Amino acid sequence: MANTKVYDGKLSTVTLNAMRLTTALLTGADVQYPQKSTMNEFYKLMTAKVPDGATRPHLGYMCVGNRGHIVDQSDVVADVVPVAKSPIASGMFSRVPLVLRTLDNDLSDEQRKQYAFRTRETIGARDYWAYYLKRIDMRAVKTTDLDITRENGIETVKDFVYTDAELNPVPKELPDYDYDDDSTVEIPDGRYVESGADLVIPWTEFDVQEYMNVTAILRGTPRSSIISEIALCSGVDTPETGESATGSQFSYNEAIGVQALYYISLFTNLAQTNDRLSLTIRIGQPAPWFLGTAN
């Protein structure tokens, strides 16, 4: 009896950028930044600086958009459907800041530590400081190996533990499984393993209110504070000199060599979640490896 994947409302796309970076980190090769592959180029921010190839970037940033969905009206009740990204995409469907502040009400130095891609923009004849990139706290993230058993449509997940059988493998016939056949969501019963990490992205009340303020400025009302695409990005922090509304200068960290590693298409309206939101995204191995029957 086959098991069926449960659709959780999100679509995840691993990018070519992610595979290139992974290969560089595995082999010790220089990290490459092909032209038109960075979020710096998409947002036209910090494009003059590129990290040295020997610098080791890691996932630690995110940006958002509001065009990662369509409305399906083929039924009586309209459905909001996420739109997947191509693995060779390097920008966003839309350009939406996470924060917009009037010139006389910029983020504090402490608040600014959580953001990057700071730029001055004019919206409706008024000037604002816009922030398009948010740093993700990766300190609690750890990799996990999962041992997954599906039997009669019921899935059991536990930590994978290496044994003497893995340390001293013997030749045997491996199960035949076509990983390239993605034409069906039916997953056969059996045993699988995967390695990855659960990345929790919390949206605090501060984050939600800032994004609702962005929507109110851009659209005249915060009612449709929609996020329907998230890019999880790698990059490198670099010191930068900013200027306040009064012309005084200050130092803060910007981000260069920012590349999308994962795109998440979803649909959420922060005006409805109101004060907070938490997303858990599994990153790492795109699909589990089939080991054969559960016995």
Feature names for model-found ranges:
Residues M1-N295:
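Long, position-biased, composition-driven segments near the start of the mature protein
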